[in-house]
Regions:
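Conserved catalytic core of sirtuin-type NAD+-dependent deacylases
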Residues: 1-273
Length: 273
């Protein structure tokens, strides 16, 4: 593996030599848009682990805590805008070099930047899904419903946490009211893949189909500590196609990389703009 210096002719050369890149992005791609990431440069958790799927579905107090924090966090998360890293990757697609972008992020900022071929591996936070009937509601609409039911919480503020969460510590969530599905009364959950929940098989299969056509893989802003993303790097390595990564700190795939650039995503990709 080659470690590139801060000025990145090796990365520019890598991208220039390939016509059908499969791009995988993670939280580091969106930190400059004001969305915190989960892990430090060693791949360790910066905070307690995110909410678990089984706990969310089985425990009312877990749902109260999640949605109370989300009520506060969504106000800024929902206003996040693409940064230069998103725009650079959209330019890569416009240049005809990115066949598919697979993102582990749930912020839809790649789409906002104009990227067309995007797979949201872990879903999208701008939708809320009923776990009973499957009905989907725009998150902004559900935000209004949460606010109407919990007006006293609207005056609170807290530091941002990853994926629209807020560090609302030491609060009593027992009085927080979580609306049920208007159609069937079912449990409402953000349309994202929680920890302990499986990525839909059709999403995984579609991503693998596109990876099978790629002539190289580019990882941007991910430590790959979560297997749902790491497995695609394993598949690329099995095909023996070149793999480059832009990430601050270690990744789970360091021994599989052809090239690694330890630099902020927007800086490393600036030559594309």
């Amino acid at each position: 593996m080659t470690n590139a210096p801060l000025a990145n002719p090796p990365l520019q050369d890598f991208i220039g030599r390939h016509e059908n890149l499969f791009v995988l992005t993670g939280a580091g791609c969106s930190t400059n848009s004001g969305i915190p990431d989960y892990r430090d440069g060693h791949g360790n958790w910066k905070r307690t682990q995110p909410v678990n799927f089984q706990a969310f579905m089985s425990e009312e107090h877990t749902r109260q805590r999640y949605w109370a924090r989300s009520l506060i966090g969504w106000r800024r998360f929902g206003q996040a805008r693409p940064n230069d890293a998103h725009h650079a990757l959209a330019r890569l697609e416009a240049n005809g070099q990115c066949g598919m972008l697979l993102t582990q992020n749930v912020d839809r900022l790649h789409q906002s930047a104009g990227h067309r071929q995007v797979i949201d591996l872990h879903g999208r936070l701008d939708l809320v899904r009923c776990m009973g009937c499957g009905r989907k509601t725009p998150r902004n609409e559900f935000q209004d419903a949460l606010g109407r039911a919990n007006a006293e919480w609207l005056t609170l503020d807290a530091a941002d946490a990853p994926d629209g969460d807020a560090d609302l510590e030491h609060a009593d969530f027992s009085s927080f009211k979580v609306p049920a599905c208007e159609a069937c009364g079912g449990i409402l959950k953000p349309d994202v893949v929680f920890f302990g929940e499986n990525v839909p098989r059709d999403v995984v299969a579609t991503a693998h189909d596109h990876l099978a056509q790629a002539d190289a893989m580019l990882i941007v802003g991910s430590s790959l500590m979560v297997y749902s993303g790491f497995r695609f790097v394993q598949a690329a390595a099995k095909r023996q196609i070149p793999i480059a990564a832009v990430n601050l700190g270690r990744t789970r795939a360091d021994d599989l990389l052809t090239l690694k650039v330890e630099e902020r995503c927007e800086a490393a990709l600036a030559f594309l703009l």
